[in-house]
């Protein structure tokens, strides 16, 4: 049930949030790219989903949940392509917009090797999140609220959770607000891809991982303005929300 899932996720998050908030904690230096220890909360939705699935149906249900996350649907190749290419495209447009606005930007230093090294940890993190958000929580939520409203509710919850790690990375208030708003839009896009593919968690994982890779590669280790990027994300999210089915789909009907 969605309520049990969200409660379990928050219970798993709290200790990591507390650890990440300790300014003198040596744990703050364990993760790369200035990530706070609270970034490990990315694994919490998946852990909560597997635990609840195991409780409901023992090991078979948990294995089914995990295997569903890698369910590739050949007929939906265009959706998988969108999942991989949409966010790099948004970041390129964001870079062009910042150039046009006269923003001071470092020279782009894109490295295929760096991008390849980033993919593995970000796929692991995306798997941990999307196994819970889309693989476990979304369908029951959409069955109750309809696809559009479920997308908005999940987006608000997800963005609120991200705000704490954003603060713990030391960014100023404007950056945190802009990034949090953009994050809500990203979840709506993830739901759009998930529904478009016909309930593929793999599409959600692909988009989520490429979002993080694109952010850190722009153009040097995440040097971007979340308000500029956020406007582009919200525009696409608004279109995605408009074309989504209003009510429950056949997959998530109660």
Please tell me what each predicted stretch does.
Residues 174-233:
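Functionally important transmembrane alpha-helices
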Residues 10, 43, 84-85, 119, ...:
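Residue-level signature of the transmembrane alpha-helical core
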Residues 24-39, 59-134, 138-144, 167-170, ...:
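Juxtamembrane helix-loop-helix connectors linking adjacent transmembrane helices
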Residues 13, 128-155, 195-200:
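Membrane-interface helix/loop boundary segments of multi-pass membrane proteins
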Residues 10-18, 88-96, 156-165, 208-217:
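Aromatic-anchored segments of alpha-helical transmembrane domains
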Residues 56-61, 241-254:
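Membrane-interface capping segments at transmembrane-helix boundaries
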Residues 4-10, 14-55, 78-83, 108-117, ...:
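Alpha-helical transmembrane segments in multi-pass membrane proteins
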Residues 43-53, 120-131, 187-188, 232-242:
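Hydrophobic cores of alpha-helical transmembrane segments in multi-pass inner/ER membrane proteins
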């Amino acid at each position: 049930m969605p309520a049990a899932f969200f409660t379990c996720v928050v219970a798993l998050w709290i200790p990591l949030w507390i650890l990440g908030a300790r300014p003198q904690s040596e744990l703050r230096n364990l993760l790369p790219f200035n990530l706070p220890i609270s970034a490990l909360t990315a694994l919490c939705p998946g852990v909560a989903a597997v635990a609840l699935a195991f409780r409901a149906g023992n090991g078979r249900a948990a294995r089914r949940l995990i295997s569903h996350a890698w369910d590739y649907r050949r007929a939906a190749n265009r959706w998988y392509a969108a999942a991989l290419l949409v966010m790099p495209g948004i970041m390129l447009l964001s870079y062009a917009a910042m150039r046009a606005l006269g923003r001071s930007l470092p020279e782009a230093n894109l490295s295929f090797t760096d991008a390849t090294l980033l993919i593995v940890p970000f796929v692991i993190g995306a798997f941990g999140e999307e196994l819970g958000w889309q693989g476990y929580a979304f369908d029951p939520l959409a069955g109750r609220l309809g696809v559009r409203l479920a997308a908005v509710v999940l987006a608000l919850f997800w963005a609120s959770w991200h705000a704490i790690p954003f603060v713990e990375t030391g960014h100023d208030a404007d950056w945190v607000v802009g990034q949090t708003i953009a994050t809500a839009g990203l979840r709506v896009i993830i739901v759009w891809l998930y529904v478009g593919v016909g309930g593929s968690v793999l599409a959600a994982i692909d988009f989520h991982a490429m979002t993080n890779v694109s952010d850190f590669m722009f153009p040097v280790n995440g040097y971007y303005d979340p308000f500029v990027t956020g406007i582009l994300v919200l525009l696409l999210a608004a279109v995605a929300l408009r074309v989504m089915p209003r009510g429950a789909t056949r997959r998530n009907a109660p």
